[in-house]
From Swiss-Prot:
Belongs to the imidazoleglycerol-phosphate dehydratase family. Coiled coil: none annotated. Pfam families: IGPD. One of its GO terms (biological process) is L-histidine biosynthetic process. It catalyses: D-erythro-1-(imidazol-4-yl)glycerol 3-phosphate = 3-(imidazol-4-yl)-2-oxopropyl phosphate + H2O. Keywords: Amino-acid biosynthesis, Cytoplasm, Histidine biosynthesis, Lyase. This is Imidazoleglycerol-phosphate dehydratase. Its EC number is 4.2.1.19. It comes from the Bacteria.
Amino acid sequence: MRLMARTATNRTATVRRTTKETDITVTLDLDSPVSTPPTTGHGFLDHMLDALARHGRLGLSVRATGDLHIEPHHLIEDVGITLGQALNQALGGRRGIERYGSAFVPMDETLAHVVLDLSGRAHLAFEPERLDVWGDAGGMTHYHLREFLRGFCNHAGVTLHVRLLAGREAHHVIEAMVKAFARALRDAVRVTSEELASTKGLL
């Protein structure tokens, strides 16, 4: 069951997604940076969602439960799906948005690069899956992040390229990629005109 709402005047949305594995509610406000600390039951995922909100300057609330006693994959992927649905709702017709965003983020020995397009077309190119990244961060791996971003892209209609230019330690790799994603998204959702950024007349 999914419950969705979008206000008529503000770029906000609330989405609830319930399955046999997870129950997730995401509230997203693209124009207010006031956020609520995330509560997913997974400490490192909460940390990354907080980084996403802060570096993306997003109003974000995520409340989630899931079958963490099995493995965090379902919860992490489903939070990405629900966040993507919320972004799609909040953007509405996407008129006036900058559309494109990119960011480099260093974290000690790590350097991440993210480029995205709010095109309405879903695609994820995730380069780090071909690299040797060491270990995990609080039970979260870069493969979990890939599934989070894949779910997000598929349900938000976003083309996303993620590159790891340097780094191997999982905590730094994941955090740098999330922060680069947040900063690229921050630029792409900005309203910079009254026109649609497409020669087709549709995003």
